[in-house]
Amino acid sequence: NIDDENIFLYSEDIDFCLRLRKDGKEIIVCPQSRAQHQESTSAPLTKEIQWRKEWNIIWSHLYVTKKHDGKLKSQRVILQLLCRHVPKMIFHGLVFEKKRFWRDLAIVNATLSYIFGRKPKRD
């Protein structure tokens, strides 16, 4: 089973490969391989979609880190994220760099949401 229901978007492939390695399986990399989604459409990258993307990338990263590397490692990553992105968020807010401000805010929000047990929205 490739899916972990706690990973809403992103990091599924990392989780899957780490589980295979844990089960003693070998991962083979084929850099020449190409994959194409059969019935895929792209939505325009609105501010809301960009927010959800950044949020889910960070939340999933923290979840997979704790799942495979333990609580201490995930706490270290949380501290690194907050120490890096809180000052950047404040700076980008002060100099009116909206796009960067919203990205950093999404990262901080996802990190805090993870700490307080809020899971990704699936709608």
In which residue ranges do the predicted regions lie?
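A short, conserved alpha-helix in the catalytic core of glycosyltransferases
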Residues: 1-34
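A generic structural signal for secondary-structure junctions
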Residues: 40-43, 69, 91
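Non-catalytic, C-terminal membrane-associated alpha-helical segments of glycosyltransferases
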Residues: 52-60, 71-123
